[in-house]
Curated annotation (Swiss-Prot):
The keyword Disulfide bond appears for this protein: no
Coiled-coil residue spans: none
Region annotation (Multimerization) ranges: 154-167
Subcellular location(s) of the protein: Host cytoplasm; Host cell membrane; Virion
Organism: Human immunodeficiency virus type 2 subtype A (isolate CAM2) (HIV-2)
Written domain comment of the UniProt record: The BC-like-box motif mediates the interaction with elongin BC complex. The HCCH motif (H-x(5)-C-x(18)-C-x(5)-H) mediates the interaction with CUL5.
Biological role: Counteracts the innate antiviral activity of APOBEC3G. Forms a complex with host APOBEC3G thus preventing the entry of this lethally hypermutating enzyme into progeny virions. Functions as an adapter molecule, recruiting APOBEC3G to the ubiquitin-proteasome machinery. Targets APOBEC3G for degradation through the assembly with elongin BC complex, CUL5 and RBX1. Binds viral RNA and affects the stability of viral nucleoprotein core. May play a role in viral morphology.
Highest taxon in the source lineage: Viruses
Main location: host cell
InterPro entries registered for this protein in UniProt: Vif (IPR000475)
Name of the protein: Virion infectivity factor
Span of the annotated motif HCCH motif: 110-141
Miscellaneous notes: Required for replication in 'nonpermissive' cells, including primary T-cells, macrophages and certain T-cell lines, but is dispensable for replication in 'permissive' cell lines, such as 293T cells. In nonpermissive cells, Vif-defective viruses can produce virions, but they fail to complete reverse transcription and cannot successfully infect new cells.
C-alpha cells in the first residue's frame, strides 16, 4: 500500500514582475538612508531540500514580534525552470505565528518604522505654522479609518509642498515601478528645504505597491 502525500498549504501572493525592485528598495533603505537599519535581509538563496529558491526580509517590531516577507522563485508543483514569483507575509512571536495581508503588513511596518505626524502638528496647523513632521508611510493608513485630524494634516502637508514636490508625487503615482528612485528623490527634495523642513527620511510606497500586488 502506497503512502499518501501530505501537503502543507500556505497563502502566497503572486507577483507579476521580478523581485529586484523590492530587494533594491530594501537594501537602499537599510544601508543608504538607515530607515530600515534594524531589518534583517537574507539574500536570494537555494532551499536545499526543494527545487525553489527564496529570499527573506525580517522586520523586528515592537515587543518580541517579527514580520517576515519571503519572496519565492519557481514556486510550482512541477520541477524545472519556470519564471514565477510569489511572496508570503508572516507575523510571528515566540509562541504564535499567522499569515497577514499586504495592508496588514503595511500597518505593522509603519508601527515601528518611518515617521508619522506628531501630536503637536495639530496645534501648529491651527495656528497656521509650518508642519515640522509628516507621514512617511501614507499607504499604511489606507486600511484604517482616518481621523479628522489626520485628514486635515494630510491636506496641509500637500498644500505646503513646493510645486516640484507635487510633480514628483504625481510621477510616483503614474509609475510605481520606480520604487528605488522614489525613495532617493524624496530624500533629496527634503534636504533642500532648510532647517524648518520636516524630519529627514524616505517615503515608503507600501508593500503591495512595490511588489505590484493588489495595487
Amino acid at each position: 500500500m502506497e503512502e499518501g502525500k501530505s501537503w502543507i498549504a500556505v497563502p502566497t501572493w503572486r507577483v507579476p514582475g521580478r523581485m529586484e525592485k523590492w530587494h533594491s528598495l530594501v537594501k537602499y533603505l537599510k544601508y543608504k538612508t538607515g530607515d530600515l537599519e534594524q531589518v534583517c535581509y537574507v539574500p536570494h538563496h537555494k532551499v536545499g531540500w526543494a527545487w525553489w529558491t527564496c529570499s527573506r526580509v525580517i522586520f523586528p517590531l515592537r515587543g518580541d514580534s517579527r514580520l517576515e516577507i519571503q519572496a519565492y522563485w519557481n514556486l510550482t508543483p512541477e520541477k524545472g525552470w519556470l519564471s514565477s514569483y510569489a511572496v508570503r507575509m508572516t507575523w510571528y512571536t515566540e509562541k504564535f505565528w499567522t499569515d497577514v495581508t499586504p495592508d496588514c503588513a503595511d500597518t505593522l511596518i509603519h508601527s515601528t518604522y518611518f515617521s508619522c505626524f506628531t501630536a503637536g502638528e495639530v496645534r501648529r496647523a491651527i495656528r497656521g505654522e509650518k508642519l515640522l513632521s509628516c507621514c512617511k508611510y501614507p499607504r499604511a493608513h489606507r486600511s484604517q479609518v482616518p481621523s479628522l485630524q489626520f485628514l486635515a494634516l494630510v491636506v496641509v502637508q500637500q498644500n505646503d509642498r513646493p510645486q516640484r514636490d507635487r510633480t514628483t508625487r504625481k510621477q510616483w503615482r503614474r509609475d510605481y515601478r520606480r520604487g528605488l528612485r522614489l525613495a532617493r528623490q524624496d530624500s533629496r527634495s527634503y534636504k533642500q528645504r532648510g532647517s524648518e523642513s520636516p524630519a529627514p527620511g524616505a517615503y515608503f510606497p507600501g508593500v503591495a505597491k512595490v511588489l505590484e500586488i493588489l495595487a
